[in-house]
């Protein structure tokens, strides 16, 4: 008994094909640091983008030291990865208020806004990915007569 051995040619998926076909982006020259602000929840982040090697300095700490959560790190790097500029700029940021999630969202918004000032033709891609939208959700205030914003005390009929 002989079995026919079929050889399959594996076509690259669209993601692999586009990643292989993407030409390396030419370096962008900026004459001064780009400064932007991002906000989310109670967090406010001021960012300075300068030409460099992809280093993050967040209040004097590295990205990994300030945000140990890998999800937050990916969230922050997403705009730079999208426009293929992860190793083109150094990011210096001052973070105020909020918690880790709010600060990460504010930092992502500030970086995306800075990238537009550097290269305006990147705007449609950043806009489509949702990186330029300021998330308006914030904590709802507590109302008197209630235990929390919407939680009412237990009701007793008799």
Curated annotation (Swiss-Prot):
Keywords: Ribonucleoprotein, Ribosomal protein. PROSITE patterns: RIBOSOMAL_S9. SUPFAM superfamilies: Ribosomal protein S5 domain 2-like (SSF54211). GO terms for molecular function: RNA binding; structural constituent of ribosome. One of its GO terms (biological process) is translation. GO terms for cellular component: cytoplasm; small ribosomal subunit. Residues 1-20 are annotated as: Disordered. It comes from the Bacteria. Residues 10-20 have a biased composition (Low complexity). InterPro entries: Ribosomal_Su5_D2-typ_SF (IPR020568), Ribosomal_uS9 (IPR000754), Ribosomal_uS9_bac/plastid (IPR023035), Ribosomal_uS9_CS (IPR020574), Ribsml_uS5_D2-typ_fold_subgr (IPR014721). HAMAP family: Ribosomal_uS9_B. Belongs to the universal ribosomal protein uS9 family. This is Small ribosomal subunit protein uS9. It comes from Mycobacterium sp. (strain KMS). The gene is rpsI.
């Amino acid at each position: 008994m002989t079995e026919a051995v079929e050889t399959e040619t594996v076509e690259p998926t669209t993601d692999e094909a586009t990643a292989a076909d993407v030409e390396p982006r030419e370096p962008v020259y900026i004459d001064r640091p780009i400064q932007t602000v991002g906000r989310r929840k109670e967090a406010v982040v001021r960012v300075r983008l300068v030409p460099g090697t992809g280093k993050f300095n967040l209040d004097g700490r590295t990205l990994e030291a300030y945000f140990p959560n890998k999800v937050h790190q990916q969230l922050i790097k997403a705009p730079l990865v999208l426009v293929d500029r992860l190793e083109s700029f150094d990011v210096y940021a001052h973070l105020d208020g909020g918690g880790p999630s709010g600060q990460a969202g504010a930092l992502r918004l500030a970086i995306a806004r800075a990238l537009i000032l550097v290269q305006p033709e990147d705007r449609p891609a950043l806009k489509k990915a949702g990186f330029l939208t300021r998330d308006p959700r914030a904590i709802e205030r507590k109302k008197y007569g209630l235990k929390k914003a919407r939680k009412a005390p237990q009701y007793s009929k008799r």
